[in-house]
Amino acid sequence: MSRLSGDLVRHKLATRIFGQNIICIDQIGSTNTELKALAGKGAPAGFLYLANEQLAGRGRLKGRKWIAPPDSSLLLSLLFRPTDVVPPPQAQQLTMLCALALIDAIEQQTGLRPDLKWPNDLVWKDGKKLAGILTELEIEDNRLLWVVVGIGLNVNLDFKKQSELDNAYGKSGNGGPPLFQTATSLSMILGRDTSADRLPILQRFLEKVERRYEALEQGQLFHQEWSRHLVGLGEPITVSGPDKTYKGMMLGVDENGALLLKQNDSSIETILAGDVTIHW
């Protein structure tokens, strides 16, 4: 069975907190939007909001969408309450934690090990996007009240069936280039049906998130490990920011998730937001 449910996810799930409270819905606009509302009403840490189809998922930048046909992807949002664990500037540690947990879960289930593209994508070796992460949070009195990490992973989806996807969802969901030029999925990489992999990947992901979050509570940070997975590490890149374009060599990220760029004059620029182009 490819359709996920709360009972299926909890069955044999080896966690104490993460994924023990679940809402699973067949079709939704955005899992992040729904879980943020629940977070504001007191939903407990580890709460999982899961969907089998997403119609209006949001990307990191305004106007970008994450849209997925039924039962094709892992579409989830996970709630953290890290008030006494990390300060607001380090909220991206939770994004990194989830990205690393997802990489490990994918590798354990399929043998594939994706790379990371700053600031929030999992990509395959050809640079095509495999998963996206969107982190949203609430701060009060300089403390994190809650953090919602949303993830969309392309599991069993053939982007080469372009006309079918365009008719249903529009080009790239954003009016951009054809999806098969920019995105990929586990099924496309492996050359087989991967619908049965959604559940075990999700369960392994939740278990690995819990272990990594326990390490975070003990003071472990993940930016150095995260940096080692970065596409373009040690390579010349261009970063197109909101107000400025930067060029230099990628050094990794700092504890706040900011990109560290060594410029031609050997100075180090810290960049909080932007899109990376790698010059191979």
Where are these regions (language model features)?
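Long, positively charged amphipathic alpha-helical accessory segments at protein N-termini or as interdomain linkers
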Residues: I17, T83-P114, W124-W280
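N-terminal lobe of the biotin/lipoate ligase/transferase fold
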Residues: M1-Q108, S195
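Conserved active-site carboxylates
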Residues: D121
